[in-house]
Amino acid sequence: MPTSIRTLTASVVIGACLAAAAGTRGADVVVAEGEFFQPQGKGWAVTPMDDSYGSHSYGGMWLTQGGCLGAAADTKDEVAVQKVTIPAAGAYRVWSKYQAPPYFNYLHRIEVLQNGKKVFEHVYGKKGTDRLWSFTGESDELWWFWGVDHDAAEAPKTAVQLAAGPAEIRLITVANPAPAGKRFIDFVVLTTEPADTYEGFKPYGTASPFTLEALAQSRVFVRFKNNSPAAAKLKLTTPVGHFQPNYAGRTTEIPEAGPVPPGQWSPWVNIGPFCRLVHDEGIVVSLPGAAGPIESEAARDAAGTDRAGAVGLPNGETFVVPLDIAWNKPRKIFTSQARAEELTRLAKTGWRTRNGGRKPQSILYYGLFYDLDRPWVAALKDALGYNTLLPAPYAHAAVDGSNHGHCHNPEELKRYVAGLSDAQKKAFKVMSFGDEISLGEINWADPAMQAKFTGWLKARGVTAAALGGVAPDAAKLADRGTNRRVGWYAQTFNEEERFGFYRDLTAQTRALIGPQAVTGANYSPHGMPMYYGPIHQWIDIFKHNGMSMYWAEDYVFSVPMPPQTISWMLATVRCGVKYNKQKIHFYVMPHAPGQRADFLRRSMIYAPGAGVNHVDNFWVGPPERHTENFVAWGYTDTYRVLHESIYDTAEAEPLLTGATVRPGRVAVLLSKATDHNERLLQIPKAQDVLMAGCKNAPATIQQIIGRVEAQMLYLALLHGQHRVDLVTEDDIAADNILAKYDVLHVAGEWIDHRVPAKLEAWVKNGGVLYASGGLGLFNEFNEADPALLKVLGLASAETKKNLAVIRPVMELPVAPAIGEIAFEGGKIPAVGLKQALVPTDAKVLGTWSDGKPAVTVRELGKGKAFAVGTLAGCAYMRTGLPVQPFPRGGNLCPVTPTTFDPAAARLARLGVDARPVEEPAVCDN
């Protein structure tokens, strides 16, 4: 058990709250699990983890024993009761451990009674209250850039004096002011520890407050029959851990009292503390000299009267303890082999299997299964339909070898290839250069790099004027932080140097392995803004042929983004590979708990249709062999989706092989100028109205609202039944791509200085330009530049902002409006950014509440140029999202919005409505 500031566990009571003997050190602790409270009416209910705000196989959201006590956001005066035993008289602090995604209230009252008298009461869950959180210590609201790990523990500083003996804990719902969230109470803790601390609090040895205290007294009893010829103990091993950061496997032997005689049953032994029941626990059994299967039984009580299943399994095999077995009576222990064989049978006889049972032939399906030497593991992988990395005699692609272990440089590549046989080289397909990596940087202080930079500037024809008056010979890499023009070109030089590194590494891979090998590096989409990576890394490297395969991932269920973000992600991928037609390798993550089966099905089917050549499910099973990414055995629907999606795609494969995604006539700009400058722009958190209320938020943060606006515009157009492409400023300025499009959408406060003139000529020729979320007031060097304003028919735009960060599912539902736009008879709340427009020859279409222009259009030649002085895409999405806390995984994950304010939808789609684009197909909702 990890160390802490002070060891708390001396005596703990859980479940039925049987008293435990007081320890000789530390504090006295009582843990009252939420699922063991008795609701006195209909307001409270025992709630499974999947129906709470946190259901995951990793991170910092954990419900001990897979459940909690839940109540709707609007309930009041509902009561639930649990009887406990106080082990020793003392002053106890009363903690509530509950789920608290930021920005919402979760009000509930705890009362403690002894001898029929109320001795304690306190209201918990008020927004802005100081609490202890996963990973971060104390804060009022929790702020993490990737979203949130939202387990909170809260207690008043004042302790209550309790006598040894019986007590009653009462949970009561109270009036819950807006914005109000559902109350999910994991457990209540009473402890004589006076400090704000818990087991593993520092240095963050656990990912959830007080969870180790609760796990230490879990109650799951097992016994076994010794079928060996000698007295023996049963060895129990967990192959790995799942509860972050406790990933190491563990071993124990039972019973502790001594070996069991041959032919006899052991006494009942509580293995609950050995298990970590925030997840299913797989346990490998070993009994020296066992004659046949080892018989084991489980129960919920020490007497073995409340049975919870029985198994017989060979030495070295695994039985599974479901995480909710302590309270969910239908749950029983089971063997991994039996469960795998059941899923295999369902795949072969019960689930839809299209294409006559023939696997895909050209689209590769990857998914890691450990222990393929076990016949039942290989049989399951084959039955699900995977066509890579299977042992004989199962059908799989002839060229499917992969290195997911990564070769980051030539030396690692050579060492890896040296270990391959000729046959393995011939069958090798996918080489990884890294997981969730950046492309790295040059050695900025290297004199050789300075000389190379000077030559690069001259070769590109960069003039002193372009460098702000600095001659190319005098432009120094060391000045990149003080001269924004030199900095822009220095960064571009750095990028191209790194492209060359990976281009060479790709060539070496092909030379060492063979021409069939493709190279890539998985890009994590979880940095800010999520699913909008640096343009040079996500687009330009593929234009420069730095890698021969695009590799990306789908963890949308784990972050506060709308589900259709996967469409944006793959549009980004296609933007990157359109130059050189690289293969696309895409992680579609099935991990359960976490990913909903219906979302997974959409992603599994959508990905091949969006151009993906390799669908990779990362880690699948057996779940007890993986740390934090897997499909738990109980998620039958997830396994079914994997099987049916693979075979559904196999039937459509003849239409997909060699095909490309039909291009659209509508585009959204991926602006490198905005991307570069927003990443450099550090906003004090006090200027972000929501971040300002989060103590643990960083003092400054990069602005992301321009890039998020591009994403939300994309989704608004997608909802309008349009095929939408993503294009770059280089596409416009250097490749003259505008002729392929009827409508272009631009978002952000920066735009490449080469682009406005191209846009003006295109609009005059009939194109429709739509600009929002900043109107390109600055060029890529962060200099005020009126060129785009002139195209829009504006003299200026007075800009105000109250948000730096928008993670749509988290901030948009609660963000205070920065203004209101009157538009076509409707009133549209604006979020994040407000620009009062000053037209020259543009017509006003919408106004702010003070009458100043907010929306304009300029007729220019045969085309039109629209300007919207706010984040129109974000305003649109805000009207469709439910006002609810962000649920990380599980059944409460937000569905794709389908109902939006008509005026907000019209505002977001002014451009495409001005020039109707004929689409070959439409979809219903």
PLM feature spans:
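Bacterial N-terminal signal peptides
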Residues: 9-19
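Extracytoplasmic
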Residues: 26-315, 327-329, 335-338
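Hydrophobic targeting/anchoring helices
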Residues: 310-316, 324, 432, 441, ...
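N-terminal carbohydrate-binding accessory modules
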Residues: 315-380
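Polysaccharide-binding and catalytic clefts of secreted carbohydrate-active enzymes
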Residues: 339, 416-568, 572, 732
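Catalytic domains of carbohydrate-active enzymes, especially glycoside hydrolases
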Residues: 354-401, 426-429, 545-550, 603-614, ...
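Aromatic-lined substrate-binding rim segments of carbohydrate-active enzymes
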Residues: 373-423, 497, 501-512
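A conserved amphipathic helix/loop scaffold
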Residues: 747-925
